[in-house]
Amino acid sequence: MKILLTGFDPFGGEPINPAQEAVERVNNNINGAEIIKITIPTVMTKSVEAIDKTIQEHNPDIVISVGQAGGRFDITPERVAINIDDFRIKDNEGNQVIDTIIKEDGEPAYFSKLPVKAMVKHMNENKIPASVSNTAGTFVCNHVMYGILYMIDKKYPNIRGGFIHIPYTTSQVIDKKNTPFMSLEEIVKGLELAIEACIIYKEDVKEIGGEIS
């Protein structure tokens, strides 16, 4: 089995991106699966193009993209991506699209092809805080998640794919009072556990994971 794991480069004025840092530190082999790791640019079109190129080169069974969501308390596998770009800030090439459809021939939304509740369960059972997220935002993270699932829908039907958001890491919150964070070591462990769950569970578990609002 091959698993493609991607992390973004720094964006939004941050000197590092814990997604990139954590992905680089994930084990190269997990439960017998080869982990292929790449850094993708925080740029709307080029990010998805880089993933597509790597899929064609390596033919992975699973694609997992990882991004930072500063302000979140835990690791959050994303349930759904929506067909809209609405950038609050510019991406790393100055693009700031507003209320723009990502793919005219795509679905209004795509649900993750990963066992998101099983991933959360496996992380929590191993003392890593995690929960299911029902919004990947409207920036490049959602764009990438939607792009992965669009490609699965249109040309890679045998691949499973999805997205995981992670919090700030320790060094990023020194000047951000009362901001949640997680150590890089915990993030790496969480990602490895999430990958394990994707290998173990072909279908998701039935457990409470919803939100009131």
From Swiss-Prot:
It holds the Pfam family Peptidase_C15. The keyword Protease applies. It is an enzyme of class 3 (hydrolase). One of its GO terms (biological process) is proteolysis. It is found in: Cytoplasm. Its EC number is 3.4.19.3. InterPro entries: Peptidase_C15, Peptidase_C15-like, Peptidase_C15-like_sf, PGP-I_bact-type, PGPEP1_Cys_AS, PGPEP1_Glu_AS. The active site is at 78, 141, 165. The keyword Protease applies. GO terms for cellular component: cytosol. Keywords: Cytoplasm, Hydrolase, Protease, Thiol protease. It comes from the Bacteria. It catalyses: Release of an N-terminal pyroglutamyl group from a polypeptide, the second amino acid generally not being Pro. GO terms for molecular function: pyroglutamyl-peptidase activity. Removes 5-oxoproline from various penultimate amino acid residues except L-proline. NCBIfam families: PRK13197.1 (NF009676), pyro_pdase (TIGR00504). Homotetramer. Belongs to the peptidase C15 family. This is Pyrrolidone-carboxylate peptidase. It comes from Clostridioides difficile (strain 630) (Peptoclostridium difficile). The lineage of its organism: Bacteria, Bacillati, Bacillota, Clostridia, Peptostreptococcales. The gene is pcp.
